[in-house]
Regions:
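ATP-dependent carboxylate/phosphate-activation module, predominantly the ATP-grasp catalytic core
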Residues: 161-226, 248-274, 282-284
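A short glycine-rich, hydrophobically flanked beta-strand micro-motif that places a catalytic Asp/Glu
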Residues: 227-239, 282
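Hydrophobic anchor at the start of a short beta-strand
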Residues: 25-29, 112, 123, 157, ...
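Peripheral (often C-terminal) accessory segments that flank ATP-dependent C-N-forming ligase machineries
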Residues: 269-358
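A short beta-strand motif that forms the metal-chelation/ATP-contact edge
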Residues: 5, 126, 172, 241-251
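Short acidic-glycine loop/turn motifs at beta-strand connectors
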Residues: 174-179, 237-241, 275, 296-298, ...
Length: 358
């Protein structure tokens, strides 16, 4: 065993699995505590609201000593006496505020959608804080703006010009001054409703004519960010343009497809980068990996045990879990030698899983 690590945040399964596969003993503090999180962890603490997270960390820390602390979404800027393996709080703050991130991109001379002023439409409206794109919306007039502000009262936001293209990201590791791109990913978004811009899956690798520009911008941004470990830079990629959208200064939702496609272990790369060691350029991915998050299409209680589908599912809920309509239910995967083959197998697996959700 390489040591005992505590992974804490809203969702931790993907990081806990990577850490376990890297040879660490893992404990987790997690909002969901799904079945498969228990497979990769020695101990777990569940919490409901983010304000409960510090107390949950305190409870598990009284039961175990830890060699490393790795925060995920929701825990990035928590004060801790544990040995942090990731980006220090004083460097992470500007990437938790989308306006500060906007100014950072501009200071790096990296293309970014421009800010819109009051009354300028259409505009992409985003809360200044928050992950996953769940409250982002394209607003086309004052009526739509007023409706958004009524739906999310007292939420500070930014307004940007629209960028048209494919959502994508680059996974990097950085030691604080240098960076190495690990994988380029296509991102899937919900596409409709209040969560139209919410993350719901990825394909790795993402082959695109602008791939080299994305990698160059991502490594430039990651090296200048002052972050440590694995981080993700989100883009929108057009036919002849690239726009930087966001910096995720933590493990990203693309961990699974990056590891499946490349064969690397991101947790090992993360720890190495935090200790000042960057990997050599990775070989070309040996396969294409695709992930899709399935959501409840109605209020429902899932009585079926999905664990027999573990070869192509993750984030597996416990039987008897209640889901509100629109809540994330389970992740499904497909792999193949080509994008088409991976997506075909993904569709086949989704069909199988849906039979258990009736």
């Amino acid at each position: 065993m390489k040591g005992r690590v505590l992974v804490a945040g809203f969702a931790t399964r993907h990081v806990a699995q990577s850490a376990c596969n890297a040879g660490y003993e893992v404990c987790a503090v997690d909002h969901f505590c799904d079945q498969d999180l228990a497979w990769y962890t020695k101990d777990r603490e569940k919490f409901d609201e983010l304000e409960d997270l510090p107390d949950a960390i305190d409870r598990i820390s009284r039961r175990h000593s830890f060699d490393l602390f790795v925060p995920t979404s929701g825990a990035e800027d928590l004060p801790t006496t544990l040995l942090l393996c990731g980006t220090p709080r004083d460097r992470i703050q500007r990437f938790l505020d989308k306006l500060d991130t906007q100014h950072f991109f501009e200071s790096c001379n990296v293309p970014v959608p421009g800010l819109r002023g009051p009354g300028e439409f259409p505009a992409m409206v985003k809360p200044r804080r928050g992950a996953g794109g769940w409250r982002n919306a394209v607003i086309r007039d004052e009526h739509g703006m007023s409706a958004w502000e009524m739906l999310y009262p007292d939420v500070p936001f930014i307004r940007q010009e629209l960028a048209f293209g494919v959502p994508a990201s680059v996974c990097c590791v950085t030691d604080g001054t240098r960076a190495r791109a690990i994988a380029v990913n296509e991102q899937y978004l919900r596409g409709s409703g209040e969560s139209a811009f919410g993350f719901c899956g990825s394909v790795t690798p993402f082959e695109h004519p602008q791939q080299a520009r994305m990698i160059a911008y991502a490594e430039q941004v990651a090296a200048a960010s002052g972050c440590r470990g694995t981080i993700g830079i989100d883009f929108v990629v057009g036919d002849d343009a690239v726009w930087a959208i966001e910096v995720n200064p933590r493990f990203q939702g693309t961990v699974d497809t990056v590891e499946m496609a490349s064969g690397c272990n991101l947790f090992d790369l993360h720890v190495g980068a935090c200790r000042g060691v960057l990997p050599a350029p990775l070989a070309r991915p040996h396969q294409v990996a695709a992930r899709s998050i399935l959501f409840a299409d109605r209020d429902m209680t899932l009585d079926t045990d999905l664990s027999p589908l573990k070869n192509y599912c993750a984030d597996i809920p416990w039987p008897g879990t209640f889901f509100e309509e629109g809540q994330a239910l389970v992740s499904v995967y497909g792999c193949g030698q080509t994008r088409e083959a991976a997506l075909a197998l993904l569709d086949k697996h989704i069909t199988t899983v849906r039979q258990y959700m009736r």
